[in-house]
Amino acid sequence: MGMLKNKSGFTLLEILVVIIIVGVLASVAMPQLFRNVERSRATEALQSLGATKRSIEGCAMQFNNVYTNCGTYALIGMTDPSYNATTNAGAHFGYAIGIGASSFTLTATRNTVENGVATDTIVLTVGTTGAVIRSGTTAFAGIQ
């Protein structure tokens, strides 16, 4: 009689089942991951817009609540948080200030760097009463 040898290892079928399970889990988890990444980037934009809003309001107080003297980042004492490959390559939005005599609009537009969609925007409009209207085309324009 011959001696039986113990064989160890996985069969091809077991390996294929594990690969299929991992693939299914990844297909469920990846869209959620990308959604959370975009949500965090939209939060970045809202924080920058909020800081800009406060700086414009502080600047306008110096000019009897007239916003026309506060239309650039230099005039409000801020560095433009827009994407610049040499200074802040991590920024995911470009920013613009639109100024009227008694109101202003701040716009964050998603950069196409890192697969952003250039048509995604977040807009804050501050009217004469100081009320802030949030709008935009990105899925997270209305996040609180």
Kindly give the residue locations of the regions a language model identified.
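Alpha-helical hydrophobic helix detector
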Residues: L16-Q32
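N-terminal leader/signal peptides at the extreme start of proteins
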Residues: M1-F10
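Ser/Thr-glycine-rich phosphate-binding loops at phosphate-binding pockets of nucleotides
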Residues: T11, V28, N36
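Phosphate-coordinating loops and pocket residues in cytosolic domains that bind phosphorylated ligands
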Residues: M30, R35, T72-L75
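Membrane-proximal N-terminal amphipathic helix
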Residues: R35-N65
